Amino acid sequence: MTICTDIIANGYDLKTLIYNSGVVSIKVIALIICLLLATAYLTFAERKVIAYMQLRVGPSLAGPFGLLQPIADAIKLVFKEPIIPAKADRKLFIIAPIITFVLSLLGWSVIPIDHDIVLSRIHIGGILFILAVTSLGVYGIIIAGWASNSKYAFLGAVRSAAQMISYELAMALSIVAVLIVTGEMDLIQIVEAQKTRPIWLTIMMLPLAVIYFISILAKTNRLPFDLPEAESELVAGYNVEYSSMAFAMFFLGEYANMILGSSLMTIMFLGGYLPPFNLEILTFIPGYIWFILKVSMVLFCFLWIRATLPRYRYDQLMYLGLKVFLPIVLAWIIVVSTILVYSNNLPIALETVLNK
């Protein structure tokens, strides 16, 4: 009914509606293909980088320099037999990886790669949409642990739920601090605000940027916080019973979330598609190039940490999230807000709301 009302109100005819639907469909398909390729080659980059750090060669047989290795891995997983445990809940067992995979892609619909390159611009709730979508991804893991009817999988799912409680508050509040400084919830406006407030969003937000980065390490179950899938304790955790494309969906979902978390960090703390320090001399380079370079830099830190640090104990993660990060973020929000008020540097949008 709403669609019909919009068509009548805006004077759209059937041809225009079909054309617009076709354009949106092409954009969605192009975005999904680019994300799948980026995710596949992130796994290749990870294996190469870690191999270099460990004085190994890494994948080098499939194609020149091993560049076809992700495609070979994808073909292998497609042709593997999907095995479902006899006592598993069949429907939930199949649905769980689909939930995780779809939600990992859904957040990309509002990410601005450049000022004019964004699938769907949400002016008010872009940040809330991403936080909601990424937080729902844990339900896929919990369902997988329950449906597998395995003790290892169930323990991995319980760990994932408790882990989310530990880091989610600190991560969300670090984003709230950025919203206070910019006075915006539109992702593009947050990037544009960093043209006029580079000191506030780089130097003042640096501690929160570090906390946010560590939180997305936990969010994506990466070392040193890969407790839900700890090989030495839980074999493979929540996905221990999965094979074939179901396992591939969990695998792709994890790496797609890595790219999504790195992209959001780039937008919040690193200037998004703007050149470094907003230097005029570098504006001739397209914004999406800067965006990709910054995201790649954050992703390299993911890989570097995996090759360097051991796994945290479970109690250490809980302590870090709730007793270290949460008080620091709350204190930093109070400090930044106080400085903004007493230095008359409140953003116009926030000042208007407070004056009312």
From Swiss-Prot:
Keyword DNA-binding: no
EC assignment: 7.1.1.-
GO MF: NADH dehydrogenase activity; oxidoreductase activity, acting on NAD(P)H, quinone or similar compound as acceptor; quinone binding
Location in or out of the cell: Cell inner membrane
Main location: membrane
UniProt membrane topology term: Multi-pass membrane protein
Residue ranges crossing the lipid bilayer per the database entry: 22-42, 59-79, 93-113, 124-144, 171-191, 198-218, 240-260, 285-305, 321-341
Keywords of the record: Cell inner membrane, Cell membrane, Membrane, NAD, Quinone, Translocase, Transmembrane, Transmembrane helix, Ubiquinone
Purpose of the protein: NDH-1 shuttles electrons from NADH, via FMN and iron-sulfur (Fe-S) centers, to quinones in the respiratory chain. The immediate electron acceptor for the enzyme in this species is believed to be ubiquinone. Couples the redox reaction to proton translocation (for every two electrons transferred, four hydrogen ions are translocated across the cytoplasmic membrane), and thus conserves the redox energy in a proton gradient. This subunit may bind ubiquinone.
NCBIfam families recorded: PRK06076.1-2, PRK06076.1-6
Quaternary assembly: NDH-1 is composed of 14 different subunits. Subunits NuoA, H, J, K, L, M, N constitute the membrane sector of the complex.
Cited HAMAP family: NDH1_NuoH
Family: Belongs to the complex I subunit 1 family.
Name assigned to this protein: NADH-quinone oxidoreductase subunit H
Lineage: Bacteria, Pseudomonadati, Pseudomonadota, Alphaproteobacteria, Rickettsiales
Name of the gene encoding the protein in the UniProt record: nuoH
